[in-house]
């Protein structure tokens, strides 16, 4: 697989997060995960399924012994935010190129499909930003714990 054609997910553990568009809150969660998703040209449904399964299985919440050993639970929340800048590359200089990012119509369809897949298996509070909008995101990170996932380098 050519490097750069990958579903990119940045997962952050939070105690609270909120996303606003033009001053209005469009998504809010308490304890849970903020997921930034970058969709590239060649991404497939199988990448979305892999990403959803991986996110819901990540054991990054503390158990009773204080060890990261538990996945996100249905009494928590997940806030998904589209972020095409995750698809940027800096192979030529300092200005990111986004030529491998999916076009907005393709990315929106796959973003919606990702939310559908995630929602089937997650019974908690699933919130989103607004696709394509300029957003302000506030979060209280827990840890911090940040996990990088990409569908074509699954060994991460």
What is the predicted function of each stretch?
Residues 92-106:
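A charged helix-plus-loop insertion that forms the helical arch/lid used to bind
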Residues 2-94, 109-156:
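N-terminal, polar/charged subdomain of small-to-medium soluble alpha/beta proteins
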């Amino acid at each position: 697989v050519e490097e750069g054609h990958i579903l990119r997910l940045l997962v952050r553990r939070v105690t609270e997060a909120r996303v606003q568009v033009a001053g209005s809150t469009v998504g809010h969660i308490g304890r849970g995960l903020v997921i930034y998703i970058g969709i590239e040209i060649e991404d497939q449904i199988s990448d979305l399924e892999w990403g959803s399964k991986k996110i819901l299985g990540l054991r990054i919440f503390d158990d009773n012994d204080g060890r990261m050993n538990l996945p996100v639970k249905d009494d928590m929340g997940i806030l998904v935010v589209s972020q095409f800048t995750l698809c940027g590359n800096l192979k030529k200089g300092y200005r990111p190129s986004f030529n491998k990012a999916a076009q907005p119509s393709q990315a929106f369809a796959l973003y919606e499909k990702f939310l559908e897949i995630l929602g089937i298996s997650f019974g908690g509070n699933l919130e989103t930003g607004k696709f394509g909008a300029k957003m302000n995101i506030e979060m209280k990170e827990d840890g911090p714990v940040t996990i990088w996932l990409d569908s074509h380098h699954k060994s991460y």
